[in-house]
Amino acid sequence: DLYSDFNIGDELRTNADALKERKDWLGTEKERLNKMIAEDCDGIVTGLYEYWACYQPSFPQKTTFIPFPIHTYPQYSNISDDIPKKIKLFIGISKSRSEYKGTDIMLKAAQAIAQKYPDQVELRMAEGVPFAEYVEMMNGSDAILDQLYSYTPSMNPLEAMARGIICIGGGEPENYEIIHEDHLRPIINVLPYYESVYQALEHLVLHPELIPLLKRQSIEYISKHHDYIKVAKRYEAFYLLCPSSGPSGTT
């Protein structure tokens, strides 16, 4: 089934955050402004597959996909072949958006796994901390849990992957197809259900030999698709193709 922050298959999500977002955006000034900007602009850049899937059908001629820009970190590129005796899981918690983003489900699954395998799993949690502190707490982790209802990793998981931290979250086939990636599969994809997250975590705990390869692929994936210099050049190229760009244009 297709899923998002708002639905799972044909069923609309009824949690408070999803209801608030629908009320905020459907049939409102926000929706009208969004549509007006989309119709008036020369180009639409989407950074997640979900964004592309929303805009491309209505604006096929001016919608493009460009991955989010991420700094690369050479100091993290030397991944050891050593298999960790204890897997360090990391999860960031924003109380106001926990249910909306699926963090509540991911946390329960991670806690259950940590309880079942106390000698093999360490669970780290960052709750309501500034981003710099969040990154400091995240560093040294083996895997991050984030974005249960997404097809693609967003900024925090991408930052983690640049540091050789495995993303457990959105890694659907569409994510790889849109960037034409046929080889690398660094993301441990999960469906938006407790059982899926639990099974994925347990599989990783029981097969820690997978970790070095996934870490290396995570770094390679970011370098190949998200390096901020490469992304900036793609933005420039797209801008130059837009009808209003250039010295004689109005942009």
Locate each region found by the language model.
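Helix-loop-beta element that forms the nucleotide-linked donor phosphate-binding surface
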Residues: K35-T46, E50-I70
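Acidic donor-binding loop of glycosyltransferase active sites
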Residues: N139-T152, I165
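Conserved donor-binding/catalytic core segment of Leloir-type glycosyltransferases
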Residues: I66, I70-K101, L107
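Short hydrophobic beta-strand element within catalytic cores of glycosyltransferases
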Residues: I166-N175
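A charged, aromatic-enriched C-terminal amphipathic alpha-helix characteristic of glycosyltransferases
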Residues: E209-L240
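Membrane-proximal helix-turn-helix segments that form the acceptor-binding/catalytic region
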Residues: E11-I44
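Short alpha-helical segment that forms part of, or immediately flanks, the ligand-binding pocket
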Residues: V135, P157-A162, Y176-E177, E181
